[in-house]
């Protein structure tokens, strides 16, 4: 047993190796979150705005508010 050589543990570069691994993981997670936000929130919102303004008439909306009496300066 005394003739067997024990393998020394790696003592240098442990922090650098862990940081590299965690930075890659954090980068991948941030890309995933950005993609989920874009396709889960931003694109549906953009589509909803486009659908609303496709048939929106400002004059018609103005006339409805005028008939409802929301403007004091217009009679």
UniProtKB/Swiss-Prot annotation:
Keywords: Membrane, Mitochondrion, Mitochondrion inner membrane, Transmembrane, Transmembrane helix. InterPro entries: Cytochrome_c_oxidase_VIc, Cytochrome_c_oxidase_VIc/VIIs, Cytochrome_c_oxidase_VIc_sf. The chain crosses the membrane at residues 14-54. Pfam families: COX6C (PF02937). It comes from the Eukaryota. Residues 1-13 are mitochondrial matrix. CDD domains: CcO_VIc. GO terms for cellular component: mitochondrial inner membrane. One of its GO terms (biological process) is oxidative phosphorylation. It is a single-pass membrane protein. It is found in: Mitochondrion inner membrane. Residues 55-75 are mitochondrial intermembrane. Pathway: Energy metabolism; oxidative phosphorylation. Component of the cytochrome c oxidase, the last enzyme in the mitochondrial electron transport chain which drives oxidative phosphorylation. The respiratory chain contains 3 multisubunit complexes succinate dehydrogenase (complex II, CII), ubiquinol-cytochrome c oxidoreductase (cytochrome b-c1 complex, complex III, CIII) and cytochrome c oxidase (complex IV, CIV), that cooperate to transfer electrons derived from NADH and succinate to molecular oxygen, creating an electrochemical gradient over the inner membrane that drives transmembrane transport and the ATP synthase. Belongs to the cytochrome c oxidase subunit 6c family. Component of the cytochrome c oxidase (complex IV, CIV), a multisubunit enzyme composed of 14 subunits. The complex is composed of a catalytic core of 3 subunits MT-CO1, MT-CO2 and MT-CO3, encoded in the mitochondrial DNA, and 11 supernumerary subunits COX4I, COX5A, COX5B, COX6A, COX6B, COX6C, COX7A, COX7B, COX7C, COX8 and NDUFA4, which are encoded in the nuclear genome. This is Cytochrome c oxidase subunit 6C. It comes from Plecturocebus donacophilus (Bolivian gray titi monkey). The lineage of its organism: Eukaryota, Metazoa, Chordata, Craniata, Vertebrata.
């Amino acid at each position: 047993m005394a003739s067997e050589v024990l393998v020394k543990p790696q003592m240098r570069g442990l922090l650098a190796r862990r940081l590299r691994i965690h930075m890659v993981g954090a980068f991948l997670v941030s890309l995933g979150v950005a993609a989920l936000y874009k396709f889960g929130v931003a694109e549906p919102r953009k589509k909803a705005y486009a659908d609303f303004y496709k048939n929106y008439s400002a004059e018609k909306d103005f006339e409805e508010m005028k008939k409802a009496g929301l403007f004091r300066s217009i009679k």
